[in-house]
Swiss-Prot record:
It comes from Geobacillus kaustophilus (strain HTA426). It catalyses: 5-amino-1-(5-phospho-beta-D-ribosyl)imidazole + S-adenosyl-L-methionine = 4-amino-2-methyl-5-(phosphooxymethyl)pyrimidine + CO + 5'-deoxyadenosine + formate + L-methionine + 3 H(+). This is Phosphomethylpyrimidine synthase. The gene is thiC. It comes from the Bacteria. The keyword Secreted does not apply. InterPro entries: ThiC, ThiC-associated_dom, ThiC/Bza_core_dom, ThiC/BzaA/B. Pathway: Cofactor biosynthesis; thiamine diphosphate biosynthesis. One of its GO terms (biological process) is thiamine biosynthetic process. Zn(2+) binds at H377, H441. Its EC number is 4.1.99.17.
Length: 562
């Protein structure tokens, strides 16, 4: 990972900052420079295009990246100056660690709540809210209102000050999450940090560390300290590792310890499968693919082994009491989501959703931010029902879905089958889309799989933004279309989501530099390019129009005034 800045950069782009009401609220954007348009009257400048930027300081020329030191604590001053947190002498969980990062965890002072929802309900517009308002090109008061109502969340653990605030809610840009993390048989800490950087380079708005192998704590520490975007986890995975991988041995005490450990590290949101209740499990018996959620299957196995109610459900109030001390958002897991088209929208899925609605109200009582996880595998004609039910049953809390995949017949191409569903469900109002890579159902994704998954989901999210009419969503489309029609090939590449791939495909057949201004590509050639023909048609229409105007001028007696 040498020369990280080069690894993260985009062609003809520079980092710019938009300053807020105070000097330390500086919102990053990526500005793409465009070449001028050639006209008969001369060259006409095209304004640069600014786009949402998730790369953090890595693309700032004034920042020297070092994964052993991590990122600067952007939000620490905002957090401390509110006066409601205290620095701990040491972690409250006994763990062995030999890591290069020197930091003391923060938590709320006794009797205090430090969540963005808590501040929003009290009419306070925090620097985090102002930051996301500038990012979204929307009024800060709207941000505050949406967070206060629970319709949006700002995942921002007080122990992850390195993160740049972002918002998840249906009134804002549709966001995407990229899953990374090792497995019991593959990957290393260096691999996962590289995947993190690669994911945010291509536009991931959050990442989830789903590590299930060795060195879970160490891997997560490196990811959090180097992540400019919120980091999510599924705590049950690490809790299971602590009991030797045997679900029956799980206890509330082990899980509670894991929650605190991860909250003190800086995890911004946690998937908690509290909706998998004992009496719902038999509803999955006749499914085609049973329970496909890892967390859901672990909890189901524990419930059946002990014939007891899910301890995450019975201890949910305590979970909220813990997480509100750090501002960890809850992502209510869909442990009974359908894993096949045959199981879509079944009784088990919607039974769990009803419980998630009940738990949402409990979390909001504690001012804990919540989003709701959703499926899964859903055919296109059943997608809308999922959004409508979630919005009604879960009181408008943000919806966060895995795809959904709209068909089961394309292993190796599930980034496509799921991006189709993601675009549709995003247009209906889903707030965040969890990416799927080409390796889904087949193996642990590598760096190139992460790229393919993120880009596929950026396409889906942007398509949904266009459908929703988000402010400024179409600006980039219009700029690229104009560049395409004017045969400004380099601008067309640079405005695309994946400039390298666009340039690579073009240059396979027309690599010469002169081809970057040619009025054709290798698909149609110079004689059959519809856009080149359109240029000729427009020129002729203008000429004919001028001739008609001249004749009209003569008919009117060659007089300017009548």
């Amino acid at each position: 990972m040498e020369n990280i800045r080069s690894f993260m950069s985009f062609p003809e782009s520079r980092k710019v900052y938009i300053e807020g009401s105070r000097p330390d609220v500086r919102v990053p954007m990526r500005e793409i420079a465009l070449s001028p348009t050639k006209t008969p009257q001369g060259m006409v400048e095209n304004k640069p295009v600014r786009v949402y930027d998730t790369t953090g300081p890595y693309t700032d020329p004034d920042f020297e990246p070092d994964v052993e030191k991590g990122l600067p604590p952007l939000r620490r001053r905002w957090i401390v100056e509110r006066g409601d947190v205290e620095e701990m002498e040491r972690s409250s969980v006994a763990i062995q660690r030999s890591l290069p990062f020197v930091r003391r965890p923060l938590r709320a002072k006794p009797g205090k709540t430090v969540t963005q929802m808590h501040y929003a309900k009290r009419g306070i517009i925090t620097p985090e809210m102002e930051f996301v308002a500038i990012r979204e090109q929307i009024d800060p008061e709207i941000v505050r209102q949406e967070v206060a109502a629970g319709r949006a969340i700002i995942p921002a653990n007080i122990n992850h000050p390195e993160s740049e605030p972002m918002i998840i809610g249906r009134r804002f840009h549709v966001k995407i999450n990229a899953n990374i993390g090792n497995s019991a048989v593959s990957s290393s800490i260096e691999d996962e940090v590289e995947k993190l950087l690669w994911a945010v380079r291509w536009g991931a708005d959050t990442v989830m560390d789903l590590s299930t192998g060795k060195h879970i704590h160490e891997t997560r520490e490196y990811i959090i300290r180097n992540s400019p975007v919120p980091v999510g986890t599924v705590p049950i995975y690490q809790a299971l590792e602590k009991v030797g991988g045997v679900p029956e041995k799980l206890t509330w005490d082990v899980y509670r310890e894991t929650l605190i450990e991860q909250a003190e590290q800086g995890v911004d949101y946690m998937t908690i499968h509290a909706g998998v209740r004992l009496h719902y499990i038999p509803l999955t018996a006749n499914r085609t693919t049973g329970i496909v959620s890892r967390g859901g299957s672990i909890i189901a196995q524990w419930c059946l082994a002990h014939h007891e109610e899910n301890f995450l459900y019975t201890h949910f109030e305590e979970i909220c009491e813990i997480l509100k001390q750090y501002d960890v958002a809850i992502s209510l897991g869909d442990g009974l989501r359908p894993g096949s088209i045959a199981d879509a929208n079944d009784e088990a899925q919607f039974a769990e959703l009803k419980t998630l609605g009940e738990l949402t109200k409990i979390a909001w009582k504690h001012d804990v931010q919540v989003m709701i996880e959703g499926p899964g595998h859903i055919p296109m004609h059943k997608i809308r029902e999922n959004v409508e039910r979630e919005q009604e049953i879960c009181h408008g809390a943000p919806f966060y879905t895995l795809g959904p995949l709209v068909t089961d017949i394309a292993p190796g191409y599930d980034h496509i089958t799921s991006a189709i569903g993601a675009a549709i469900i995003g247009a209906y109002g889903t707030a965040m889309l969890c990416y799927v890579t080409p390796k889904e159902h087949l193996g642990l994704p590598n760096k190139e799989d992460v790229r393919a998954g993120v880009v596929a989901y950026k396409i889906a999210a942007h398509a949904a933004d266009l459908a929703k009419g988000h402010p400024a969503a179409q600006q980039r489309d219009d700029a690229l279309s104009k560049a395409r029609f004017e045969f400004r090939w380099n601008d067309q590449f640079n405005l695309s989501l994946d400039p390298e791939r666009a340039r690579e495909y073009h240059d396979e057949t027309l690599p010469a530099e002169a081809a970057k201004t040619a009025h054709f590509c290798s698909m149609c050639g110079p004689k059959f390019c519809s856009m080149n023909i359109s240029h000729e048609l427009q020129r002729k229409i203008k000429e004919e129009g001028m001739k008609e105007k001249a004749q009209q001028f003569i008919r009117q007696g060659s007089s300017l005034y009548q």
